[in-house]
Amino acid sequence: MTMYDLTDSGKDMCSSLCLLAEVAVMVAEEEQFRRLLKTVSKEEDSDKSFFYRFPRKIRSSLVKRRYTQQNPNGASTSSAVLDLNLITTDYDLKTQQNPSFDEPLVGLGKTEKKNLTNPNYQSSSSSSCLTENKSRKRRAVQQRKSGKLKKARVVSLPRMSIETPEWVFQVMRYMNADAETPRLIFERTLFNSDVKSGLSRLLIPFQQLIRNDFLTPAECRAIQKDEDNEDDKNIGVGTILVNQRSKMWGLRFKIWAMEKDSGHGTLNYILNWGWNDVVKGNGLKAGDNISLWTFRCRGVLCFPLET
């Protein structure tokens, strides 16, 4: 009788241990599943687009366009100072090649203006893409107007050495920018149209570019768009504009064909989607002289603005 009781007790103990083991396995599997969901969630967050991280200001003329879905409430967030933590963090560090930023900047204090015998003076993938863009835009303007497209006048600039301002290097170090030489691409005196709130854009004519090799092939493809397409499928390239006080704004950079009453048209780049906030934040007015430089921060195109 005693042996029978001990046997039952042993069976009960074994059953309890098996039950505990099963519970432990279930708990471990649940924890692993939660970790997997967390990893997937992080990957999905890292894949979100530039315009999700830097929401643009909704304009009334753009309400019906598809990209309003990125900001359905129409809230204006472009006026806020951008947080560097919002910039894409999953940029490939192997290609970034920026272990020590101070060393690559030594000796990079100068850039040269080129004689613009042709706006596309550099034979690169980006300039060839720009040439294709110009041909398409010319055809689009010609279809809307019977007149001929006005040819860009060649502007010959004196060959001179321009020293990069020290504040540009300081901003690059502050933003932990990619190790590359900052490039001066544009200088101009602002007109009334550049600071008019109803237009909210900075016009950058092709023929006034100092250099045009600052776009990647992917960015060239992103700004290609048929001007007759009302859907505006191309939303341009997301960029960051930064001033001398390291204050930043998220803007859109794209191509724009400007028509004239004569039937002629010109091709330009524009910076918009928040340009009014840049004007207010820097106190810009007609007659001010500005300079635009370029560099990249984790692959994102950045424009230092000197006033």
From Swiss-Prot:
| One Pfam family recorded for the sequence | At2g31720-like
Q: What is this protein called?
A: Putative B3 domain-containing protein At5g35780
Asked whether the keyword Electron transport is assigned, the reply is no
Gene Ontology CC annotations of this record: nucleus
Q: Which UniProt keywords apply?
A: DNA-binding, Nucleus, Transcription, Transcription regulation
Question: Gene3D superfamilies given for it?
Answer: DNA-binding pseudobarrel domain
| CDD domains registered for this protein in UniProt | B3_DNA
- Its source organism is Arabidopsis thaliana
* Compartments reported by the entry: Nucleus
Bias-annotated ranges (Basic residues): 135-149
Q: Which GO terms describe its molecular function?
A: DNA binding
| UniProt keyword Nucleus, yes or no | yes
Task: Locate the DNA-binding region by residue range.
Answer: 206-307
The segment annotated Disordered runs over: 112-149
InterPro entries the UniProt entry points to = At2g31720-like (IPR005508), B3_DNA-bd (IPR003340), DNA-bd_pseudobarrel_sf (IPR015300)
Identify the main location: nucleus
